[in-house]
Amino acid sequence: MAEQIYTIPVNDAFDSECECPMCQMQRELERNAIEYTMGPSYMEDDNRAMTDKLGFCSHHLRLLYQEKNRLGLALMMNTHMNKTIKDMKELAAKGPAAKAGLFGKSTPNAPIVDYIESMEKSCFICGRIDNMFVRYVDTIFHMWKKDTEFREKFADSRGFCTYHYG
């Protein structure tokens, strides 16, 4: 099967001398996502809106701090924090959730608690990686079905880590 643009990252991972090609693809996706985030994209309105909304997990924030473009990170974090503070003030002004009576069902979380929990679980970079990784997995299955050369490459690989094997 002729190599297509969508098969290149998968072939590169299976060609590399690594213990787990899936981990290799994730590392490459993470490296690309960090470079994309810290590149000129941080000045684009749609990307800035996404980073303002999603923010970054602690792992990826640490990696962003290690990059050279500190001004770009400062701009992203400034607009993200301004949006977060504005959203939290609006939610705090609404007040706590109504309490149930003595024998009532448990009350739902206050909206501000739900907002904070959702912010802790969101990350712009994790989202980019997950979105692309699903496509890579689909590509692996497609190539395994259609490409005998890839099937041999797959069989000759060292296998997968326990995380990706499961």
Show which residues each predicted segment covers:
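Intrinsically disordered, low-complexity regulatory regions of eukaryotic proteins
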Residues: 1-166
